[in-house]
């Protein structure tokens, strides 16, 4: 269960509660996150949908430098959804929304 102020800052949802299952691909090089948002309620319009909207509306990528990536993507119309937040000195995380409304998560490994 993921909840708390830091999580709401990353997603821009404020008070949230989400169950997450993290799976590793058989080759060990990638991971797939499955999320079920319990709080807040769900909104259906994907163009302005929050991070917890139903359906496949987001993907997450590992980046070497999250701030450099944000600067580069910002030049192409990508906007930060919530805040850039550190999770337990393990990851620096954020979500961005591209010009077509697709949500992209960015994760920088800190260790």
What are these regions (language model features)?
Residues 1, 55-61, 107-111:
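N-terminal beta-strand motif that seeds the catalytic metal site of vicinal oxygen chelate
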Residues 1-5, 82-85, 108:
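Conserved catalytic-core motifs of GNAT/GCN5-like acyltransferases
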Residues 14-20, 99-106:
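Short, structured secondary-structure boundary patches
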Residues 26-31, 36-103:
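Vicinal oxygen chelate
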């Amino acid at each position: 269960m993921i909840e708390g102020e830091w999580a709401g800052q990353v997603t821009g949802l404020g008070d949230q509660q989400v169950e997450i299952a993290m799976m590793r691909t058989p080759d060990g090089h990638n991971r797939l996150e499955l999320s079920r948002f319990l709080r807040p309620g769900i909104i259906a319009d994907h163009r302005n949908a929050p991070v917890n909207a139903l359906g496949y509306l987001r993907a997450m990528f590992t980046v070497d430098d999250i701030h450099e990536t944000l600067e580069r993507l910002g030049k192409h119309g990508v906007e930060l959804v919530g805040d850039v937040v550190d999770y337990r000195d393990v990851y620096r995380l954020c979500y961005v929304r591209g010009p077509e409304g697709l949500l992209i998560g960015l994760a920088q490994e800190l260790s």
